[in-house]
Every structure is written in C-alpha cells, then in structure tokens.
Design a protein with these regions (language model features):
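Structural preference for beta-rich elements and adjacent junctions enriched in aromatics
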Residues: 1-186
Length: 186
C-alpha cells in the first residue's frame, strides 16, 4: 500500500508502537478479506513512522472489542517526509507512506484464501485523519475541542471507520489492466 499526504506543516507526537495513532495526523488501512463485516484488521501510521495494528473480531457498534496486542507479523512500513517534521519555521510539501503486509500475517483472520485468487474481492477502506493545530514554541500543538478532518476512500455515511459493510471492494486479478489511448485504464 502507498499513500501521499499533502500537508504544509508535517508534525506528530506519538512514537511508541500501539499508541492510539489516530490521536495524531495519520493514514489508516482497514482490511476485511472475506467481506462479512467481522474479523477485520486495522493498521495506522503517523509521520513519525509510529504504528498501531489491531484485530477486531466484530465492529465496535456490534459489541466488538479490539485485540490491541495483535500484530501484523512481518509487516514492513516506511515514511518519507518531503520537508521537515515538527518544525514550524518552514513550509513542507507533505509525507508519503509505504506499507507491505505479508499474506501470512492476515491468513489466520482472513476467512478466505490468503493470498487471494484472481477474481476474489476484499472489503477495504483507507482513511486520512488530520487535526488543526496552533504554533507553539517553534513546533505544533493540536487544538483541543476541534474535531479532526477525515478523508476516506469509500464514503461511510458517518464519521466512523468501523462500519465495514460500507467499505469499498478491491478485486484481485492476475491480468494486466487494459490501457486506452491516453495510457489510462479503461
């Protein structure tokens, strides 16, 4: 997975694994391989490359509780800052995230073939959380009492990422995409 976040002032505070990363600006990945709305996985990462990965047997709204001790075994992740981090004296372009999750890390909770076969579809969503901030002593301080902005790949109809039945589908294929005259997929 990869994501590019435009952000004129890249900042973060959390550095410890399995902190509640969505308390910082972050990027999030949600995976429900069999698409049943249960047994799904979540991964969050902030500009400081701190991560939070968790497994949910069922959604919070259905009485589910997250397993915070669970990890994507063998996951690789990296953050690239285009600018500086936690420096209010300049203007940044943003930050980029790359995440590689081994199929074996998801197999136990997939409920379907993992790796998937051509034609299989998984429920997936992506989220970008961004907070308003104030300048403080050459850095940044998140504004208290101001809700964060949330962007999602597949609209939820609510500010709640834990509605897996509203996530989009990713279909796997062993075929190369067809290209039109402009070189774009048709």
């Amino acid at each position: 997975f990869g994501a590019d976040m435009e952000e004129p002032h890249v900042w973060g505070t959390l550095t410890k694994r399995d902190s509640v990363i969505c308390q910082d600006n972050d990027f999030e990945i949600f995976l429900d391989p069999d698409g049943d709305g249960e047994r799904y996985m979540e991964f969050e990462i902030n500009p400081l490359n701190a991560v939070w990965d968790l497994y949910l047997p069922k959604a919070y709204s259905k009485g589910g509780e997250a397993d915070h001790a669970w990890d994507f075994e063998g996951i690789r992740h990296a953050v690239q800052i285009d600018g500086t981090v936690n420096c209010a004296d300049d203007v940044d372009r943003g930050w980029t995230v790359e995440v590689a999750i081994p199929w074996t890390a998801m197999a136990e909770h997939a409920g379907c073939d993992c790796p998937p076969k051509s034609g299989d579809a998984w429920r997936v969503n992506f989220s970008r959380v961004e907070y308003e901030y104030d300048y403080h002593k050459g850095g940044y301080l998140r504004r208290d009492g101001v809700p964060c902005d949330n962007w999602v790949w597949s609209p939820q109809g609510a500010i709640n990422m834990h509605i897996p039945e509203m996530w989009g589908y990713v279909e796997f294929s062993d075929q190369l995409p067809a290209h039109g005259e402009a070189g774009r997929p048709q």
